[in-house]
A protein has these predicted regions:
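Local sequence-structure signature of Cys/Sec-based thiol-disulfide redox active-site neighborhoods
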Residues: 7-39
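Short, glycine/charged-enriched secondary-structure capping and boundary segments
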Residues: 27-30, 55, 76
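Structural micro-motif
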Residues: 53-64
Length: 100
C-alpha cells in the first residue's frame, strides 16, 4: 500500500452506473486503495453527471489526478466492465508514483 504524502497529487476514482444495470455492478470499486473513492454515481438519476463526464456506456470508472481526468475504464457493449480491479489499481499506483 502506498502512503499518501501531504503536498503531492490527489488521486480520485469515480464510478458511474445506473440502477437498471445493477447486475453489472463493480463490487470491488470501494476496495481500491490509495485514492478517494466517491461511491456510485447513478446516471439514471443524475443526468448532469452523465453529460459533464461524457458517460457513453456503463459501468465506467474515471481516474482523476488533481481534478483532471487521466484514465477511463468502460464496459463493453454487453455492459460488463472489461478492466479488472488489478488494472484499475495499477493505474492509480502509476499516477501516484509519477510524482516521484
Amino acid at each position: 500500500m502506498l502512503i499518501p504524502v501531504f503536498g503531492f497529487s490527489q488521486v480520485e476514482a469515480k464510478y458511474f452506473n445506473a440502477a437498471w444495470n445493477s447486475s453489472n455492478d463493480i463490487n470491488w470499486f470501494m476496495g481500491l486503495q490509495d485514492c478517494n473513492t466517491k461511491g456510485i454515481v447513478d446516471i439514471g438519476k443524475d443526468k448532469e453527471a452523465q453529460a459533464k463526464y461524457k458517460i457513453a456506456v456503463i459501468p465506467t470508472i474515471i481516474i482523476f489526478k488533481d481534478g483532471e481526468e487521466v484514465a477511463r475504464f468502460q464496459a463493453d457493449l454487453s455492459f460488463k466492465m472489461v478492466a479488472t480491479k488489478e488494472e484499475v489499481q495499477e493505474e492509480i499506483n502509476n499516477q501516484l508514483m509519477s510524482d516521484f
